[in-house]
């Protein structure tokens, strides 16, 4: 518990204290009754838990719109899935609702899974993390991981149209004329786009050069 104290009173405890310093005031706990001691203990524990929940919220709020790797914990009878995300002491459970799952894809507890963080909000039990497999940015983040030219800013993904589980079409453009944006995303022997297709369980990926004329995509 932090309180402000007058400098004169502080120097009665520690003669060497200066303005702005902290002073520890010893307390004789024998003067407190059992109930008061238990109450103080609960206040401290509650403060620690609130601080932990706040830190967990800040951690996952900073990961909003990121692609994370997790492990399937369980699947409810409703079809909603719970996924353990994070590493070490920063692990947390996220919800992958049935509406955010790709039709036809099934998982068992213990299976690894990549999910996209779409929302994080506070709750009395800690941060509620909502994740998705169907969001168009799942495709975007996968190509960012597989394509160095995107990570380096040489190629941009300008638009994505997606039918989750069926096909996606992405429009890309190069920042420099000597860079082939489609070839960069396809990769040598189709390795880069192939890795994305594999992660999406066979979803077809069409890659086209971006144009300001929508009719060119038809």
Predicted feature descriptions by range:
Residues 1-218:
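RNA-contacting regions in translation and RNA-metabolism proteins
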């Amino acid at each position: 518990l932090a309180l402000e104290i007058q400098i004169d009173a502080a120097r009665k405890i520690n003669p060497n204290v200066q303005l702005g310093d902290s002073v520890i005031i010893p307390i004789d706990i024998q003067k407190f009754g059992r109930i008061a001691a238990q109450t103080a203990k609960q206040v401290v524990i509650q403060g620690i838990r609130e601080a932990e929940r706040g830190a967990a919220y800040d951690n996952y709020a900073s990961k909003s719109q990121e692609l994370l790797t997790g492990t399937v914990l369980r699947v409810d009878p409703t079809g909603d899935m719970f996924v353990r995300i994070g590493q070490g002491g920063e692990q947390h459970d996220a919800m992958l609702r049935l509406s955010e799952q790709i039709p036809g894809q099934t998982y068992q507890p213990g299976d690894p899974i990549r999910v996209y963080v779409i929302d994080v909000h506070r709750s009395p039990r800690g941060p509620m993390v909502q994740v998705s497999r169907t969001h168009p940015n799942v495709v975007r983040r996968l190509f960012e991981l597989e394509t160095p030219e995107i990570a380096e800013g040489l190629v941009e993904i300008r638009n994505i149209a997606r039918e989750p589980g069926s096909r996606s079409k992405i429009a890309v453009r190069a920042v420099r004329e000597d860079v082939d944006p489609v070839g960069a995303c396809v990769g040598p022997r189709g390795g880069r786009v192939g890795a994305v297709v594999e992660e999406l369980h066979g979803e077809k990926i069409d890659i086209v050069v971006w144009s300001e004329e929508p009719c060119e995509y038809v």
